[in-house]
Design a protein with these regions (language model features):
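Active-site regions of metal-assisted phosphoester/phosphodiester hydrolases
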Residues: 1-149
């Protein structure tokens, strides 16, 4: 899933994070108990996976309440969402994903607002998480995740 969360309203942003987590829980519940499949009918079952990768411009920093909400433990049998960067680089400073070149818009300077979050059951497949801080093609820097298939 790719996303671009609210920038101006923290309340709206937290509602978006809440809904992302609810969609993940719904997909996992359906995966565990898929129900009756009626192929080639309007009732054909489209199973959603319990594994999830969500990336994009989340418009929150790693110390924000929205970040804490995104990575908070999920009750029940739903796999938690983890930050891919922290999984690969647990002791490293986070690479900036915005404010590198556009200092007018980002008065705060270089910092992170873009992430790859994925389910904990994909963590062992992460090979690389990197940020290209050399390009000025956008006000955000490209972030890349490589997984073992």
């Amino acid at each position: 899933m790719n996303t671009h969360l609210e920038f101006f309203s923290e309340k709206q942003q937290q509602a978006q994070v809440k809904r992302i987590r609810e969609l993940h829980q719904e997909a996992c519940a359906q995966f565990r108990e898929p129900g009756i499949d009626l192929p080639n009918t309007p009732f054909e079952l489209l199973v959603r996976p319990e594994k999830m990768i969500i990336c994009g411009d989340f418009n929150f920093t790693p110390d924000s309440e929205s970040y804490k909400q995104m990575t908070a433990p999920i009750l029940g049998k739903t796999p938690d969402l983890i930050d891919a960067w922290n999984t690969v680089h647990p002791d490293a400073s986070r690479a900036p994903t915005c404010g590198v070149f556009d200092h007018k818009q980002w008065e705060k300077g270089p910092h992170c607002r873009d992430y790859f979050f994925l389910t904990q059951n994909l963590a062992q497949r992460i090979q690389e998480v990197s940020v290209n801080i050399k390009t000025d093609a956008s006000d955000h820097q490209p972030i890349r995740l490589i997984l073992e298939v």
